[in-house]
Amino acid sequence: MIKKFFITGTDTNVGKTIVSSILLKKATMSGYQTAGYKPVSSGGQKKSSGFFNQDAILLKKSSSIILSDREVNPIAFFENAPPHILSKFQKRSIKKEELSLGLNNITKKSNWILVEGAGGWYTPLSCKDTFSSWVKQEKLTVIIIIAIKLGCINHAILTEKAIISDQIKCGGWIANNIFPKDKYNMHYIQTLLNYIKSPFLGVVPYFKNKNRINFKKIKIKLPK
């Protein structure tokens, strides 16, 4: 059975990619053929083949199957701004059909796929479509990444309510410590446990060096 998940966040810069890489590694260790997919990205670097996004590079490295840059990230914008705005200025339309084509291609090679969105749940793809409408179309199970910081509780509750109101399955949430641990961190998480109804998958600790992560020691569960 092929498992397909969509990673969203309560905000931008909540650590979606690092958590995605951990989930991909965990799924690989559980015996799955894994693939990370970032259909749309903004903010990149020059490569001989064009522009490529650092988040997409990490997803590619964290996948167990071999994927090309284009397979992981078919739509990449060099500047760091909302994709629908860059799409308008660069006259490069973002169509849901193109996102689906890339996903279908990866599905032929992998049985555990993690799709990373951009920003939060209602990030626009165009003037009429959002990532959420595409996720609903593809019937993906959503995982919420919550960065533990001031404001995260309200953002998390709103995000889960939006997903449920869109009649999409929320497979769980992960607390990501993006700042060094302080005395209130566990109180944030305890409050989230009281309010968020979706399964709690675990906590990602704060990392000083994200290039030296012991994946086996991170106690997060794979979504069902």
UniProtKB/Swiss-Prot annotation:
Give the primary localization class: cytoplasm
Entry annotated with the keyword Glycosyltransferase: no
* CDD domains in the cross-refs: DTBS
| Keywords, ordered alphabetically | ATP-binding, Biotin biosynthesis, Cytoplasm, Ligase, Magnesium, Metal-binding, Nucleotide-binding
InterPro entries, alphabetized: DTB_synth_BioD, P-loop_NTPase
Keyword Protein transport among record annotations: no
Q: Which gene encodes it?
A: bioD
- Role played: Catalyzes a mechanistically unusual reaction, the ATP-dependent insertion of CO2 between the N7 and N8 nitrogen atoms of 7,8-diaminopelargonic acid (DAPA, also called 7,8-diammoniononanoate) to form a ureido ring.
Query: Organism classification, top ranks?
Result: Bacteria, Pseudomonadati, Pseudomonadota, Gammaproteobacteria, Enterobacterales
Tell me a GO biological process for this protein: biotin biosynthetic process
Organism the protein comes from: Buchnera aphidicola subsp. Acyrthosiphon pisum (strain APS) (Acyrthosiphon pisum symbiotic bacterium)
In which residues is substrate bound? Answer: 42
Q: What cofactor does this one take?
A: Mg(2+)
The molecular function GO annotations come to: ATP binding; dethiobiotin synthase activity; magnesium ion binding
Membership in a protein family: Belongs to the dethiobiotin synthetase family.
Reactions this protein catalyses:
(7R,8S)-7,8-diammoniononanoate + CO2 + ATP = (4R,5S)-dethiobiotin + ADP + phosphate + 3 H(+)
Compartments annotated for it: namely:
Cytoplasm
Under which name does UniProt file this protein? ATP-dependent dethiobiotin synthetase BioD
Write one Pfam family the protein is assigned to: AAA_26
Q: How does it assemble?
A: Homodimer.
Residues noted as binding Mg(2+) in the record, renumbered to the chain? 17, 55, 116
Task: Tell me the active site.
Answer: 38
User: Which NCBIfam families did the record assign?
Assistant: bioD (TIGR00347)
Q: In which pathway does it act?
A: Cofactor biosynthesis; biotin biosynthesis; biotin from 7,8-diaminononanoate: step 1/2
Task: Write the Enzyme Commission number(s) for this entry.
Answer: 6.3.3.3
| Gene Ontology cellular-component annotations | cytosol
